[in-house]
């Protein structure tokens, strides 16, 4: 066996790769519960890929057969109902762990120098994940899938001059049809997963090149022993591979409780209108995207005034796009001399708390029908959302920070 491994290693550096990225990759010894979510995101990604492959085997990507094939999977394919619930619950679980992963990065300054590329790759993963979720959302060909896709694609029509042609190009038809379903299926099953996997690899390579951040925001490479090993670091394997098993166990418990007992999650994961086949002639009472898009949808609806000759719909699209785009420049907006919220001042802590609260409430407002009062609240919270980023260069530079220790703490 050793001879075989040596033969392979001479031609493919398997052992070197293992040592660099796992066995001899030294991670800070003070990781806490917030550091579970990166590995959990990988776990959910594997779940989505495996269940997606099996669902594709029985799915019919046509306007005539899509809805019926989903019902066939649920009723006649052995364990088909489980595969679908694993996939639909996994989609929401993916966004849960990704949002928590992003929150941890904001909390501990994991985007600051020299980790800007890690953040950029992470944001690209988030963007591709949103596209992947949107494409997959149409595939059940239910009422909410159909009309939700119709609303989102029509948003591109708000762009001056090219909007209508762009919407037509995305749909491949004058309305959402089997042609749209086919191209969304191809993107969801083939193109976007390839891009997603590539970005995940780049994200991990960039992380392992500069090293992991930690709750103190301290670079452990600055304190090494006589062997060149960080004094505050421990090998990722076996310490964190075993450590992460606890997080995986807790996650699986919650995940499977949802899968087996609450797969629809009261209409948040699987909406009731989606149990009816798509009907282009009948609009649902209330059209709303899946919960993980609703904060941005609430921002879109919050814009109600035409400006400089352009309709409110256009400005709503700009606000929604800007809310995502501004995340990419966070590494250059934060001017704080420290990374972690543990040592930042009250201004940064208060700003982050208001930002998170605004995002959560916007998520709720995007789920429910718009009223005058809700629209006003959404407008205020949208302003808070953007102020968190736009004022960041000022409050992070002005505030008084705490002294950062030379070595990591517990």
Across the structure, where does each feature detected by a protein language model lie?
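Membrane-embedded and interfacial regions of multi-pass energy-transducing membrane proteins
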Residues: 1-93, 97-410
């Amino acid at each position: 066996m050793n001879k075989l491994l040596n033969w392979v290693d001479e031609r493919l550096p398997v052992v070197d790769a293992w040592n660099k990225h796992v066995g001899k990759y030294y991670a800070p010894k003070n990781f806490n519960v917030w550091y579970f979510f990166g590995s959990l995101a990988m776990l959910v990604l594997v779940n989505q890929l495996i269940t997606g492959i099996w669902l594709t085997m029985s799915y019919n990507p046509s306007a005539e057969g899509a809805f019926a094939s989903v019902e066939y999977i649920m009723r006649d394919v052995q364990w088909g109902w489980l595969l679908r619930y694993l996939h639909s619950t996994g989609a929401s679980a993916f966004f849960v762990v990704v949002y928590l992963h992003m929150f941890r990065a904001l909390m501990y300054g994991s985007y600051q120098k020299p980790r800007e590329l890690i953040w950029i790759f992470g944001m690209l993963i988030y963007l591709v994940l949103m596209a992947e979720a949107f494409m997959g959302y149409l595939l059940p060909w239910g009422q909410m899938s159909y009309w939700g896709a119709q609303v989102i694609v029509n948003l591109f029509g708000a762009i001056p001059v090219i909007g209508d042609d762009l919407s037509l190009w995305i749909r491949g038809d004058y309305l959402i049809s089997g042609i749209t379903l086919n191209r969304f299926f191809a993107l969801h099953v083939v193109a976007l997963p390839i891009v997603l996997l590539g970005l995940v690899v780049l994200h991990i390579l960039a992380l392992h090149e500069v090293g992991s951040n930690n709750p103190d925001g301290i670079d452990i490479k600055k304190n090494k022993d006589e062997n060149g090993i960080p004094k505050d670091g421990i090998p990722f394997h076996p310490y964190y591979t075993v450590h992460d098993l606890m997080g995986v166990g807790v996650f699986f418990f919650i995940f499977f409780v949802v899968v087996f007992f609450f797969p629809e999650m009261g209409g948040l994961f699987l909406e009731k209108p989606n149990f009816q086949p798509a009907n282009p002639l009948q609009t649902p009472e209330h059209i709303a995207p899946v919960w993980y898009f609703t904060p941005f949808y609430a921002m879109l609806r919050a814009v109600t005034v035409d400006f400089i000759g352009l309709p409110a719909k256009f400005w709503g699209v700009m606000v929604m796009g800007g809310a995502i785009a501004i995340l990419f420049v966070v590494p250059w907006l934060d001017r704080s001399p420290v990374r972690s919220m543990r040592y930042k001042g009250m201004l940064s802590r208060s700003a982050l708390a208001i930002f998170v609260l605004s995002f959560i409430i916007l998520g709720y407002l995007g789920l429910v029908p718009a009223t005058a009062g809700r629209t006003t609240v959404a407008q205020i919270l949208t302003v808070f959302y953007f102020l968190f980023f736009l004022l960041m260069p000022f409050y992070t530079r002005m505030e008084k920070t705490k002294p950062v220790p030379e070595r990591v703490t517990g």
